[in-house]
Amino acid sequence: MNRIDERFAKVKADGRKALITFLTVGDPNMEVSEKAIYTMQEEGVDLIELGVPFSDPAADGPVIQRADERALAQGVDIFKVFELVRKIRNNVEVPMVFLLYYNVMVQYGIEKFFKRCQETGVDGLIIPDLPYEESDEIKEYTEKYGVYQISLVSVSYTHLTLPTTM
């Protein structure tokens, strides 16, 4: 059972809604990102989305785009994000998921990326530019390494396509 399953079972048992937070790692810097994650845990969040900075975050709005630019200007990349998760994982029980673009995974190497997620304690991935219908190519790795893919549903989905994709 993944930390996400455990947390959502607790949320359900408590009869409450989950509080999910987001931050772009490295904005304004790595130290503040680390402190923010600890603060989120102390304040009782249920899941933390860690935005992995990307040079062309087409699926994100202007606020996240500017945050990515600031983090990238400081040299934050997937290697530094993995290192942060590795550093804090033993002290952070809250599930952590990456919000990242598929190209980051491809450049890293797909299986190597999933293995690193497992090693560092990343619980799941939100990949906005990988449509669910095309996600079969990573399914074997999500299962092998126990890292969840959390799919997004676009406003262009209809009542006809949604049941076939979920």
At which residue positions do the language-model features occur?
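N-terminal amphipathic alpha-helix/helix-capping segment at the start of soluble metabolic enzymes
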Residues: 1-20
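Active-site beta->alpha loop and helix N-cap motifs at the rims of alpha/beta catalytic domains
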Residues: 68-126
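Active-site-adjacent beta->alpha loops and helix N-cap segments on the catalytic face
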Residues: 2, 59-61, 76-83, 108, ...
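Glycine-rich, proline-tolerant flexible connector loops at the mouths of alpha/beta enzymes
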Residues: 49-76
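Catalytic beta/alpha-barrel core
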Residues: 123-134, 148-157
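Single conserved hydrophobic/aromatic residue that forms the stacking wall/gate
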Residues: 159-166
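Conserved, mostly hydrophobic/aromatic
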Residues: 21, 51, 117
